[in-house]
Regions:
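Alpha-helical solenoid repeat scaffolds of the TPR/TPR-like class and their adjacent stem/linker regions
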Residues: 1-101
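PAPS-dependent sulfotransferase catalytic domain
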Residues: 53, 58-80, 100-192
Length: 192
């Protein structure tokens, strides 16, 4: 999937995407699992204007439903995103917070795996901030191996070789996003 994302988003010009008027600001906190996303969200949500929403699955579910078929991305649908379908996802995402009756203006979504969807994030939410949590690769991979994650979503985390392969593909994808939209990604190093 990572190579597929790079291939499909390579020719997208994110500078041409119109900014939407957002009633609430959103900060996406992402990175490899066990890279510090929870800690970053806890620090940010201690501010009175920030609501820490935790790991939301809405974005990934919406992308899987509307843009992926057997882990293959429909490029035409990405191109069409600049039409009303993008607006619908944008509005629906914020509607999921209506049940909370929030008086806070900033919302965080700390789903680590959202690093895969940074291209979609910049189309759906051009004004969103993205914090990419980075950790020493060896420490991150050992921590992944020592934890018991759900096999359905992270079956690669049970084997050291698969973890290394996944991390390498992650690193290539992150390098692509940072080259493609450098001013929109803030990299936060766990050890600093």
């Amino acid at each position: 999937l990572f190579k597929e994302l790079i291939k499909k988003f390579d020719n997208i010009d994110f500078e041409k995407i119109k900014n939407k008027v957002e009633t609430k600001k959103i900060i996406f906190i992402c990175g490899m699992p066990r890279s510090g996303t929870t800690l970053v969200e806890q620090i940010l949500s201690s501010h009175p204007e920030v609501y820490g929403a935790g790991e939301l699955l809405y974005l990934e579910n919406s992308i899987n439903k509307n843009f992926l078929e057997n882990n293959i991305i429909n490029r035409q649908k990405i191109i069409d995103l600049q039409s009303s379908s993008s607006e619908n996802v944008f509005l629906d995402y914020f509607k999921c917070f209506d049940i909370y009756n929030l008086d806070k203006n900033i919302i965080t979504d700390k789903t680590p795996q959202n690093f895969k969807w940074i291209g979609f994030i910049k189309i759906f939410f051009p004004n969103a901030k993205i914090i990419l949590c980075q950790r020493n690769p060896k420490d991150n991979c050992v921590s992944l191996f020592k934890n018991d994650f759900p096999a359905l979503t992270m079956n690669w985390s049970f084997d050291q070789e698969e973890i290394a392969e996944y991390y390498n593909e992650y690193h290539k994808l992150i390098s692509f996003w940072k080259d493609k939209i450098p001013k929109d990604i803030y990299q936060l190093n766990y050890e600093r």
